């Protein structure tokens, strides 16, 4: 694996000289191997090590190189066709393979090759991009988007129209991460490498990027880029220093533990946010 890693790192430094006509079978095989391993869930662009998220930048480089190396090709999809560099994940699946991997995919959902879909995941008509990892038991609801290299944990609910930001460029940016047992409400957007920690509940219509103020009203503090575990978050606003106007903020209205969350429905938690 170290040889493959170094080959990809070296090639990425010369990426401007690489295109679909490049004759380098070793590089093509290395990139193909990495994409296949991400697709199977054996490799992840980001993973938790000793309680901290670690991003493997070389895997992002492999994904980017695949765009340089691959030419557009015809992709069949139901009643229509597509012209793209990345094939559909399920292009070669038959019923036996779908049953063996234990997922449910509802038409016209689109999952690109190089995205991992865990067991008991339900993919409604939605979009999952290359490099993403969707953990077992998760619901990707209708018109949700899971961006490139985004990491979605186990037993997560991504409600209708949710957007989880992708990140391939700029390369130094970290992927957006939704940890296990989170609920993301309809039409919410979590982007720019924000981490939503385990068991958090995000209400409908909450937008969080790296510059979004996340106000913890219980502790009277402002956070950036991270929603703490067990937080219940709703959209709101905070006043300006001179009191002339207010600007958007995400508001942590309460914290819940796993026991409370198991006993109380998501809607009840949000209705009692006051």
From Swiss-Prot:
<dbReference type="GO" id="GO:0019877">
    <property type="term" value="P:diaminopimelate biosynthetic process"/>
</dbReference>
<keyword id="KW-0457">Lysine biosynthesis</keyword>
<keyword id="KW-0220">Diaminopimelate biosynthesis</keyword>
<dbReference type="InterPro" id="IPR001451">
    <property type="entry name" value="Hexapep"/>
</dbReference>
<dbReference type="InterPro" id="IPR011004">
    <property type="entry name" value="Trimer_LpxA-like_sf"/>
</dbReference>
<dbReference type="InterPro" id="IPR005664">
    <property type="entry name" value="DapD_Trfase_Hexpep_rpt_fam"/>
</dbReference>
<keyword id="KW-0012">Acyltransferase</keyword>
<dbReference type="InterPro" id="IPR018357">
    <property type="entry name" value="Hexapep_transf_CS"/>
</dbReference>
<protein>
    <recommendedName>
        <fullName>2,3,4,5-tetrahydropyridine-2,6-dicarboxylate N-succinyltransferase</fullName>
        <ecNumber>2.3.1.117</ecNumber>
    </recommendedName>
</protein>
<dbReference type="GO" id="GO:0009089">
    <property type="term" value="P:lysine biosynthetic process via diaminopimelate"/>
</dbReference>
<feature type="binding site">
    <location>
        <position position="141"/>
    </location>
    <ligand>
        <name>substrate</name>
    </ligand>
</feature>
<dbReference type="InterPro" id="IPR037133">
    <property type="entry name" value="THP_succinylTrfase_N_sf"/>
</dbReference>
<comment type="similarity">
    <text>Belongs to the transferase hexapeptide repeat family.</text>
</comment>
<dbReference type="GO" id="GO:0005737">
    <property type="term" value="C:cytoplasm"/>
</dbReference>
<dbReference type="GO" id="GO:0008666">
    <property type="term" value="F:2,3,4,5-tetrahydropyridine-2,6-dicarboxylate N-succinyltransferase activity"/>
</dbReference>
<keyword id="KW-0808">Transferase</keyword>
<dbReference type="InterPro" id="IPR050179">
    <property type="entry name" value="Trans_hexapeptide_repeat"/>
</dbReference>
<dbReference type="InterPro" id="IPR023180">
    <property type="entry name" value="THP_succinylTrfase_dom1"/>
</dbReference>
<dbReference type="Pfam" id="PF14602">
    <property type="entry name" value="Hexapep_2"/>
</dbReference>
<comment type="subunit">
    <text>Homotrimer.</text>
</comment>
<feature type="binding site">
    <location>
        <position position="104"/>
    </location>
    <ligand>
        <name>substrate</name>
    </ligand>
</feature>
<keyword id="KW-0963">Cytoplasm</keyword>
<comment type="pathway">
    <text>Amino-acid biosynthesis; L-lysine biosynthesis via DAP pathway; LL-2,6-diaminopimelate from (S)-tetrahydrodipicolinate (succinylase route): step 1/3.</text>
</comment>
<keyword id="KW-0677">Repeat</keyword>
<keyword id="KW-0028">Amino-acid biosynthesis</keyword>
<dbReference type="Pfam" id="PF14805">
    <property type="entry name" value="THDPS_N_2"/>
</dbReference>
């Amino acid at each position: 694996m170290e040889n493959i890693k170094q080959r990809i790192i070296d090639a990425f430094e010369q990426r401007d000289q690489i295109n679909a006509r490049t004759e380098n079978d070793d590089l093509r095989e290395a990139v193909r191997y990495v994409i296949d391993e991400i697709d199977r869930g054996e490799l992840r662009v980001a993973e938790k090590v000793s309680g901290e998220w670690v991003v493997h930048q070389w895997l992002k480089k492999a994904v980017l190189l695949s765009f340089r190396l691959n030419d557009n090709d015809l992709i069949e999809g139901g009643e229509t066709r597509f012209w793209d560099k990345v094939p559909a994940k399920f292009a070669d699946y038959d019923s036996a393979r779908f049953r063996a991997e234990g997922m449910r995919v509802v038409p016209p959902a689109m999952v690109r090759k190089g995205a991992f879909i865990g067991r008991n995941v339900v993919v409604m008509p939605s979009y999952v991009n290359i490099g993403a990892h969707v953990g077992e038991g998760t619901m990707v609801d209708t018109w949700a988007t899971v961006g490139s290299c985004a990491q979605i944990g186990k037993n997560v609910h991504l409600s209708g129209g949710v957007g989880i930001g992708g990140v391939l460029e700029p390369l130094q940016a970290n992927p957006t991460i939704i940890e296990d047992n989170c609920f993301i409400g309809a039409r919410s957007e979590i982007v720019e490498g924000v981490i939503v920690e385990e068991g958090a509940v995000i209400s409908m219509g909450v937008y969080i990027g790296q510059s979004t103020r996340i106000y913890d009203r219980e502790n009277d503090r402002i956070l950036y880029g991270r929603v703490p575990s067990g937080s219940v978050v709703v959209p709101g606003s905070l006043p300006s220093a001179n009191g002339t106007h207010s600007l958007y903020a995400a508001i942590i209205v309460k914290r819940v533990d796993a026991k409370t969350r198991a006993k109380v429905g998501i809607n009840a938690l949000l209705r009692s946010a006051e």
